[in-house]
């Protein structure tokens, strides 16, 4: 039976989420790719245990994480039931709904019917009475924002979520949503968005500035740009890489020779800081205190340990920041 490390809280920094009472670990663990039915169950357990032993208390899921849809929640729920659940009050568990989950008009987007039905299903798969954070997973251009935000508020009012969050929103829509949730007295605390040295969308669409103004947290996903910001591709594209074996999310065409040159230069900059490229990429996201936590994935426990090293050096010189911008901004 798993027993958590006694010194787990000495290994991680915890950051207040906006102006709320909730704190997140600087590094959080996402269960997007490696906790579905194609994963090895014992490896999933070791990844989660390694994370928790090192102070990572936040585990992020969504209804359709897998593959297959729902399988990441199901496997996570099994691990909770068998071993990790004794620490439930020390864990921050989130899930989401907003992308396609089941057939028909009620299995996608942002209707009240979809969101609340999906949350009930997620709780059942994980064997939980509530989640700590329930997110709407993406903006819905057709459903009234009042309906979607009302569904999030209902999740809290029914005791099925403690806090709510928004994922993949832009600045203007965030501002409108926040006003609705504030009127509903709903504890909206966090935004989840893609952010990395190579992807500055939240700087361009107003999300980062608006979240700061509204005193809401941000948790950044894909901080390593689907592996581009690691040593994985420094010598080209390996045959066993995700680009070659699974092109759904990462296309070979995205890794041009020009991009590889930039990656190698960034790697040299990281080495000068005494970091790996991945460590520097994570540190860069945390550099200004606006992003609360960085969401990392892991296919093996060792990757969790490597990612945690990023919190040891989040200070950058002006010259380092200038060079990073020069190599990454289009």
Regions found by a protein language model. Name each.
Residues 1-91, 157:
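N-terminal binding-site loop/beta-alpha segment at the start of enzyme catalytic domains
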Residues 2-11, 143-330:
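Beta/alpha (TIM)-barrel catalytic core signal, keyed to glycine-rich beta->alpha loops juxtaposed to Asp/Glu
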Residues 18-36, 94-107, 130, 135:
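N-terminal small/glycine-rich loop or linker at the start of catalytic domains
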Residues 25-29, 59-61, 91-95, 134-136, ...:
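Hydrophobic faces of well-ordered beta-strands that scaffold small-molecule active sites
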Residues 35-40, 64-72, 140-144, 171-172, ...:
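Acidic-and-aromatic substrate-binding clefts and catalytic sites of carbohydrate-active enzymes
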Residues 38-51, 110-126, 174-178:
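Short, acidic/polar
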Residues 39-43, 71, 75, 106-114, ...:
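Alpha-helix N-cap and loop-to-helix initiation/capping positions
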Residues 123-143:
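Active-site groove signature of glycoside hydrolases
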């Amino acid at each position: 039976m798993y027993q958590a490390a006694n010194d787990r809280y000495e290994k991680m920094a915890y950051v207040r989420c906006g102006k709320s009472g909730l704190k997140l670990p600087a590094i959080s663990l996402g269960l997007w790719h490696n906790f579905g039915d194609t994963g090895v169950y014992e490896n999933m357990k070791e990844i989660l245990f390694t994370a928790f032993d090192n102070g990572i208390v936040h585990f992020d899921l969504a209804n359709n994480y897998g593959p297959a849809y729902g399988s990441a929640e199901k496997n996570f729920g099994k691990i909770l039931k068998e071993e990790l659940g004794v620490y439930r009050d020390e864990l921050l568990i989130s899930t989401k709904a907003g992308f396609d989950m089941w057939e028909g008009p009620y299995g996608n987007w942002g209707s009240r019917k979809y969101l609340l039905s999906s949350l009930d299903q997620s709780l059942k798969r994980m064997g939980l009475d509530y989640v700590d954070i329930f997110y709407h997973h993406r903006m819905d251009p057709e459903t009234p924002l009042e309906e979607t935000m009302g569904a999030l508020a209902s999740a809290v009012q029914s005791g099925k979520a403690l806090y709510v969050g928004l994922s993949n929103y832009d600045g203007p829509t965030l501002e409108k949503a926040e006003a609705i949730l504030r009127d509903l007295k709903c504890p909206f605390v966090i935004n989840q968005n893609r952010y990395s040295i190579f992807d500055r969308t939240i700087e361009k669409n107003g999300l980062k500035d608006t979240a700061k103004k509204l005193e809401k947290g941000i948790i950044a996903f894909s901080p390593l740009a689907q592996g581009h910001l690691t040593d994985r591709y420094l010598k080209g594209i390996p045959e066993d890489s995700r680009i070659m074996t699974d092109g759904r999310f990462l296309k070979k065409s995205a890794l041009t020779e020009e991009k590889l040159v930039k990656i190698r230069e960034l790697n040299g900059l990281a080495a000068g800081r005494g970091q790996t490229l991945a460590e520097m990429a994570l540190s860069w996201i945390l550099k200004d205190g606006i992003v609360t936590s960085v969401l990392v994935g892991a296919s093996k426990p060792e990757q969790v340990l490597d990612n945690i090293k990023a919190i040891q050096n989040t200070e950058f010189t002006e010259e380092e920041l200038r060079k990073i911008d020069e190599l990454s901004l289009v």
